[in-house]
C-alpha cells in the first residue's frame, strides 16, 4: 500500500492510527470540511515530523450530505491512487457508506481497527457478508 485514504474523524487518534501502523507514502484525509483542515493541518504535520515520518498529506473535501458527490469524489481519489487502502475505523456515516460501496464496486480494500484484538483487519475480504440478503429474516416484532 502506497496510499492510505483516511475517513476524517473528529477524533485525532482515529485519524493517525492506521498511518502509524502502516506508514504510507501518501495519506489522504477524506471528508474534512475546510475549517477542520485549517485547524488541524499544522497539528498533523507536527505529529508526523515528531515521529520522523513525512508522508505526503492531502485533504479532500466533499459535501457530506450529498451521497452522489461523496461517491464521485471517493471514486476519483481511488482511480488516481490505484495502490490504496481505505481505513473505515472512523469518519462520517456517509463516508463509511461510500467506502463500502467502493469496496464492492471498485474492489478497494477496507481496513478497520478492532479494539478487542488491537489489530487492523481487512474487512473487505468478507464481501459475501456485505451482499447478504437479510430481508425476510427479521421483522419489527422480533425486537419487541
Roles of regions detected by a PLM:
Residues 88-97:
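Ordered, amphipathic secondary-structure segments that act as subunit-interaction surfaces
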Residues 1-84, 97-144:
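Long, low-complexity, Lys/Arg-enriched
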Amino acid at each position: 500500500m502506497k496510499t492510505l485514504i483516511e475517513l476524517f474523524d473528529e477524533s485525532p487518534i482515529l485519524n493517525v492510527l492506521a498511518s502509524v501502523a502502516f506508514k504510507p507514502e501518501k495519506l489522504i484525509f477524506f471528508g474534512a470540511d475546510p475549517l477542520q483542515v485549517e485547524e488541524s493541518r499544522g497539528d498533523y504535520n507536527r505529529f508526523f515530523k515528531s515521529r520522523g515520518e513525512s508522508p505526503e498529506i492531502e485533504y479532500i473535501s466533499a459535501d457530506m450530505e450529498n451521497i452522489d458527490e461523496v461517491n464521485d469524489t471517493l471514486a476519483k481519489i481511488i482511480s488516481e491512487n490505484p495502490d490504496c487502502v481505505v481505513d473505515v475505523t472512523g469518519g462520517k456515516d456517509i463516508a463509511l457508506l461510500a467506502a463500502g460501496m467502493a469496496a464492492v464496486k471498485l474492489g478497494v480494500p477496507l481496513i478497520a481497527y478492532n479494539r478487542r484484538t488491537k489489530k487492523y483487519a481487512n474487512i473487505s475480504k468478507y464481501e459475501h457478508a456485505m451482499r447478504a440478503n437479510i430481508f425476510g429474516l427479521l421483522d419489527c416484532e422480533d425486537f419487541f
